[in-house]
């Protein structure tokens, strides 16, 4: 059974609200969030973005594939269809039907190559979902 894709109205090429969000989240945690959101932004020319539920979201057109959010002591890099992503490095956390996230903490080593692959796979996954209806 196929489920309808989640769609967000208002995604734009570069959302000034996200730049303001990044400025408001300065410091170590903000730098981590900005680093990984930049990776999402660079996935392709069709990437759009918006602030949704208080955090930066990366979309393919209006279909979201990833987000970042800053918490008290960590950053989440999240994936809207993360449950469907291959995760050989076992970075993904969460038990929901669709979403998963990777928790990043300052001073703790990050498997950057594996996280970059997850972001790439999330982008390719949403692209296939959009193209195949």
Predicted regions span which residues?
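Charge-dense, helix-prone N-terminal extensions
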Residues: 1-133
């Amino acid at each position: 059974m196929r489920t309808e894709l989640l769609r967000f109205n208002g995604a734009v090429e570069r959302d000034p609200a996200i730049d303001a969000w990044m400025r408001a989240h300065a410091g170590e945690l903000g730098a981590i969030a900005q680093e990984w959101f930049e990776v999402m932004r660079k996935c392709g020319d069709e990437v759009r973005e918006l602030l949704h539920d208080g955090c930066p979201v990366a979309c393919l057109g209006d279909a979201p594939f990833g987000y970042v959010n800053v918490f008290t002591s960590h950053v989440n890099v999240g994936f809207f269809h993360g449950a469907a992503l291959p995760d050989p490095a076992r970075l993904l956390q969460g038990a929901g039907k669709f979403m998963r996230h990777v928790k990043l903490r300052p001073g703790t080593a990050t498997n950057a190559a594996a996280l970059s692959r997850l972001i790439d796979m999330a982008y390719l996954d949403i692209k296939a979902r959009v193209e195949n209806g």
